[in-house]
Curated annotation (Swiss-Prot):
It is found in: Cytoplasm. Its EC number is 6.1.1.14. The gene is glyS. Its main location: cytoplasm. Keywords: Aminoacyl-tRNA synthetase, ATP-binding, Cytoplasm, Ligase, Nucleotide-binding, Protein biosynthesis. This is Glycine--tRNA ligase beta subunit. It catalyses: tRNA(Gly) + glycine + ATP = glycyl-tRNA(Gly) + AMP + diphosphate. Tetramer of two alpha and two beta subunits. It comes from Pectobacterium atrosepticum (strain SCRI 1043 / ATCC BAA-672).
Length: 689
C-alpha cells in the first residue's frame, strides 16, 4: 500500500480568537507526537485554523505500522521448573501472558545463564484503525483552560463541535471524535459560498474550502493578506497603519474571508489624547489606527470585514456609526476630567483598597512619595520633582477617562499634569512609572521617572512580602516577578548606584508597623536575585556563571551585572578551566582543614621555590587588583588573575600542602586562602564547570 495524505478537520462554533494559533499549533504538535509514538512514518504536518475550524494535513502518511519482531524474556530455567522438571507457576503465568504454553517457549542461552524466551513476528496495525483514536488523544491534550459541554452530550471541548472529517487519501476513516461521527461534510462561510459541501480526497484541502466555502483556512496566508491590504489601504490615504502583531493575530482569528476597508471619524476628536482614541479603536473595536509620517494620529481607521459586500460603503458607514459614540465618550471624559486638577483626586484614593492589610491607594501614594524622594536623592535626580510625581502618581486612577478606559492609566496622568502646569519631568514620570511593562519594553526616560518607577514597584514588593504573600508557583496576583525584573532592568541598564539592601530596607521601613514578616528584607532580596538568574539565563549566560556570582550575593544590581559579564569573559580565557579546577581544589582543602590560619603569609617559613613564586605573584597582584576591585573593573581583574595559572599549577605539582610541620602547613593553607580570597572578590569560580 502506498503512502497517502491524511486530513482531519474539526468544525466548531467560533473559537476563542486570542487562543486560535496556540490551539492549532498544539494540535499539530500533539498529533505529530502521536504519529511518532505509533511509529507511523509521515511527511510534513501542516495546520490550518479559522474561526470555526481546526485542521491538520499530513503528507505521505504510511498506510500501516512496520512489522516488528517481539521478544519477551521469561524466568530463568532454574526458576521455571521444579525439581521434578514440571513448570512452576511463575513460568506458566509468563507463558499465559504471551499466549503460549511453557512447552512452546524457546530458550535463550547466554554466558550469564539460560532463560525461557518468547519470540514472535508482530504485524503492524493499519493506520486507518489508529487515526481516530490518535486525533482524540491529541485534542484532549490541547491547552484549554475552560471546557464546554453542549446539547445533551457528555463530551467537552473549547467550543461545541458540529463536524468531523477524517480522510486518508480518498478513504473516509470511520470513527467518532468528540462524540461526532467522521463524515465528508465540510462547512463553508456563514454568509458566502456553499454552506455545506462534501470533500472526496484529502488532497483537495484547503483549496476546495477556499473555492466552494469562501474560507481562507491557511492562518498565515490570511494574516499576510490582511497585513498587505491594510498597508496598501493606509498608503492610499497618506498614512501608516498601526499593525501591532497582537491585534493582527486577533483580527486574523476573527475572520474567514478578510476584506480590508478604510473608514474615518470626525477631526474634532483629535483634540482628545490619541492614546484614548487608540485604546477604543484597538481594544474595543479591533480597528487599526492610522498615523502620518510624523507619528500623529489621522482621522481614519482600517478594519477587516468578514464578508465581501456588494455595497462596502454600507459596512464602512456602520463601523463609523459604531465607533463615534465611543470617541464622543472619550471626548466628554477628557473635557470633564480637566475641570479638576489632578491633585484634587487625592482624597478619593482613600476609598480604594490597595490590599486589605496594607491600606488604601492613598496610603500607597504616601509611601511612594517618600520612597521616590529617597531614590532620587541616591541617584542624583530632582528630589522635589520626584516627590511631587509620587504624590500625583495614582490620581489619574480616579478620573472618568481611566475608569472607562483602564489601559490609559499613566498616560492620562501625564496629559492632565501638563494641563495643570506641572513640571514636564513630573508629567512624563506619571506615564513612565509603569515601565517596563513587559520583556523588552522601554525603560523610563528620565531620572525622576526612574525614581518613581522604582518606588512604585519596590513598595509592592516590600508590602506583599511583608505580609507573607509572595508568589507561589504560577500564581502572582500582584505581578511581583515583573516588578522585580523591572527594578533590576532600570538599575542595571541606567547604571544607577542603588543597593538592593538599603533600597529594600527603606521600602519596608515606610510601612511602619503594618508588616508582619520580620524576614521581608532578606526574602525580597533573595527573590530579586532569583529574577537576576532568570534574566541572565535568557541573555545567554550559563547557569554556573550566574551561580558563581550569586555565591557572593552582591546586592548592587549594576555591580552584579559587571561581575556576570566579567566571569563570562573569563571563561573564554585559556587559563579559566585550570584556575576554576584549582579554586575548587583549594576550597575543598580549606573546608577539610581544622588548622587556624594566620592573618598573613610568613615569608620566612616559605621553603619550596613554587610556593615562594606563588606568594610573590600574589603580593604583586594584590597591589594591582585593589583599585580594580574598588572601581568595579572586574573583567580587568580576572584577566590579571588569569596570569596565576602557571604558578598555581606549579604549586600543586611541587608542594605538599598538608605538610607534617604545623608551621609550614598553616603557612601554605594561609597562602591558598589568600589566593582564593582574591578570586572571591569577583565571584566563586570554583563552581564553574
Amino acid at each position: 500500500m502506498t503512502d497517502k495524505t491524511f486530513l482531519v478537520e474539526i468544525g466548531t462554533e467560533e473559537l476563542p480568537p486570542k487562543a486560535l494559533r496556540n490551539l492549532a499549533e498544539s494540535f499539530a504538535a500533539n498529533f505529530t507526537a502521536e504519529l511518532d509514538a505509533a511509529n507511523l512514518a509521515h511527511g510534513d504536518v501542516s495546520w490550518f485554523a479559522a474561526p470555526r475550524r481546526l485542521a491538520l494535513k499530513v503528507a505521505r502518511l504510511s498506510a500501516s505500522q512496520p512489522d516488528r519482531e517481539v521478544e519477551k524474556r521469561g524466568p530463568a530455567i532454574s526458576q521455571a521448573f521444579d525439581a521434578e522438571g514440571k513448570p512452576t507457576k511463575a513460568a506458566e503465568g509468563w507463558a499465559r501472558g504471551c499466549g503460549i504454553t511453557v512447552e512452546q517457549a524457546e530458550r535463550l542461552t547466554t554466558d550469564k545463564g539460560e532463560w525461557l524466551l518468547y519470540r514472535a513476528h508482530a504485524k503492524g496495525e493499519q493506520a486507518q484503525a489508529l487515526l481516530a483514536g490518535m486525533v482524540s488523544t491529541a485534542l484532549s491534550k490541547l491547552p484549554i483552560p475552560k471546557l464546554m459541554r453542549w446539547s445533551d452530550k457528555e463530551t467537552q471541548f473549547v467550543r461545541p463541535v458540529h463536524t468531523v472529517t477524517l480522510l486518508l487519501g480518498e478513504e473516509l476513516i470511520p470513527g467518532q471524535v468528540l462524540g461526532i461521527h467522521s463524515a465528508r461534510t465540510i462547512r463553508g462561510h456563514r454568509f458566502m459560498g456553499e454552506a455545506e459541501f462534501t470533500i472526496d480526497n484529502a488532497e483537495q484541502y484547503p483549496q476546495i474550502l477556499l473555492e466552494r466555502g469562501k474560507v481562507v483556512a491557511d492562518y498565515d496566508a490570511r494574516k499576510a493578506k490582511i497585513k498587505a491590504d491594510a498597508e496598501d489601504a493606509a498608503r492610499k490615504i497618506g498614512g501608516n497603519a498601526d499593525l501591532s502583531d497582537s491585534l493582527l493575530e486577533e483580527v486574523t482569528s476573527l475572520v474567514e474571508w478578510p476584506v480590508v476597508l478604510t473608514a474615518k471619524f470626525e477631526e474634532k476628536f483629535l483634540a482628545v489624547p490619541s492614546e484614548a482614541l487608540v485604546y477604543t479603536m484597538k481594544g474595543d473595536q479591533k480597528y487599526f489606527p492610522v498615523y502620518d509620517n510624523s507619528g500623529n494620529l489621522l482621522p481614519h481607521f482600517i478594519f477587516v470585514a468578514n464578508i465581501e459586500s456588494k455595497d462596502p460603503q454600507q459596512i464602512i458607514s456602520g463601523n463609523e456609526k459604531v465607533v463615534r459614540p465611543r470617541l464622543a465618550d472619550a471626548e466628554f471624559f477628557f473635557n470633564t476630567d480637566r475641570k479638576k486638577r489632578l491633585e484634587d483626586h487625592l482624597p478619593r484614593l482613600e476609598t480604594v483598597l490597595f490590599q486589605q492589610q496594607l491600606g488604601s491607594l492613598r496610603d500607597k501614594t504616601d509611601r511612594i512619595q517618600a520612597l521616590a524622594g529617597w531614590v532620587a536623592s541616591q541617584i542624583g535626580a530632582d528630589v522635589n520633582h520626584a516627590t511631587r510625581a509620587g504624590l500625583l502618581s495614582k490620581c489619574d486612577l480616579m478620573t472618568n477617562m481611566v475608569f472607562e478606559f483602564t489601559d490609559t492609566q499613566g498616560v492620562m496622568g501625564m496629559h492632565y499634569a501638563r494641563h495643570d502646569g506641572e513640571a514636564e519631568d513630573v508629567a512624563v514620570a506619571l506615564n513612565e512609572q509603569y515601565q517596563p511593562r513587559f520583556a523588552g519594553d522601554e525603560l523610563p526616560s528620565s531620572a525622576v521617572a526612574c525614581a518613581l518607577a522604582i518606588a512604585d514597584k519596590m513598595d509592592s514588593l516590600a508590602g506583599i512580602f511583608g505580609i507573607g504573600q509572595h508568589p507561589k508557583g504560577d500564581k502572582d496576583p500582584f505581578a511581583l516577578r515583573r516588578a522585580a525584573l523591572g527594578v533590576l532592568r532600570i538599575i542595571v541598564e541606567k547604571r544607577l548606584p542603588l543597593d538592593l539592601q538599603t533600597l529594600t530596607e527603606e521600602a519596608v521601613r515606610l510601612y511602619g508597623t503594618k508588616l508582619t514578616n520580620t524576614k521581608a528584607v532578606d526574602e525580597v532580596i533573595e527573590f530579586m536575585l532569583g529574577r537576576f538568574r532568570a534574566w541572565y539565563q535568557e541573555e545567554g549566560h550559563s547557569v554556573d556563571t550566574i551561580q558563581a556570582v550569586l555565591a557572593r550575593r552582591p546586592t548592587r544590581p549594576a555591580d552584579f551585572d559587571a561581575r556576570v559579564k566579567a566571569v563570562s569573559h573569563f571563561r573564554s580565557l585559556d587559563a579559566a578551566a585550570a584556575l576554576a579546577a584549582a579554586n575548587k581544589r583549594v576550597s575543598n582543602i580549606l573546608a577539610k582543614s581544622t588548622d587556624k590560619l594566620n592573618e598573613s603569609v610568613n615569608a620566612a617559613v616559605l621553603k619550596d621555590a613554587a610556593e615562594i613564586t606563588l606568594a610573590t605573584h600574589l603580593v604583586v597582584l594584590r597591589d594591582k587588583l585593589t583599585p580594580l576591585f574598588a572601581e568595579g573593573r572586574y573583567q580587568e581583574a580576572l584577566v590579571e588573575l588569569a596570569s596565576l595559572r602557571e604558578p598555581v599549577d606549579a604549586f600543586f605539582d611541587q608542594v605538599m600542602v598538608m605538610a607534617e610541620d604545623e608551621q609550614v602547613r598553616v603557612n601554605r593553607l594561609t597562602l591558598l586562602s589568600q589566593l582564593r580570597e582574591l578570586f572571591l572578590q569577583v565571584a566563586d569560580i570554583s563552581v564553574l564547570q
